[in-house]
Amino acid sequence: CLLSRGLGDVYKRQIYFRANAEKKLKRTVHQWRPVIDYSEKDVWEVMKRNKVNPHPCYRAGWNRCSCAGCIFSTPELFAGFKELYPQEFEEMKHDEKALGFTLDNKCDLETYIEGAKPCLYKGDKEAIHSLITGIFTESQIFIDGQWKYPAGAFHGAEGGPC
C-alpha cells in the first residue's frame, strides 16, 4: 500500500475495509481512498475539470459536508444551521435543557453562536432548496455552464456540518 504523508499505517491509500471477512465468508473487501494525498485545492480542481456540481452544503457556504448539527461545528456553522433549520436548532436547544448538558462545555447553544456571522450563502437558491427538501437529482450532478468554486471552498476544516 502507498502511504500518505509519512504517517505510517495511519493513512494508507488502500486498507482492508471493516466488513472484510476472509475467513468466514471467503471474501476480501478493500477500502480505497484515492484522494487521501490531495490538498483541498487538488480536489476542487478535479471537480472543476470534470464539471462536477459540488454538494449543496459547499454551495450554501459550509466548509465541510457531514452531520448538520455536528457537535464540532463552529459558532458560524451553527448560526448557519439555525438560519437554515430553525426548528431543528430549537430542538437542539430543548435537548440541551432536557439533558442538562450543553454541546459546548462553557455555554448553551444560543450563547455559543451569539455575535457569529452565519456561514450561510443565500446566493445559490438551488443549493438552499436541496438542503431544505433533501432533493438532489441525477441531472444536477454535472454542470453544463461555467464551473465556479462554491461559497464554502477554502474556509478551513473546522467543524463538520451538513
Describe the role of every protein-language-model region:
Residues C1-Y11:
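Single conserved hydrophobic/aromatic residue that forms the stacking wall/gate
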Residues L2, A68-I71, L120:
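Secreted/luminal cysteine- and crosslink-motif detector
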Residues S4, G61-R64, G156:
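Processing junctions and N-termini across compartments
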Residues D9-K26, S73, Y85:
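Short, surface-exposed, charged loop/turn segments at secondary-structure junctions
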Residues N20-D42, N50, D95, L99-G100:
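Short, flexible loop segments at boundaries between secondary-structure elements
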Residues I36-E91:
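Mid-to-C-terminal catalytic subdomains of enzymes
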Residues V52, S73-C162:
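Peripheral terminal appendages
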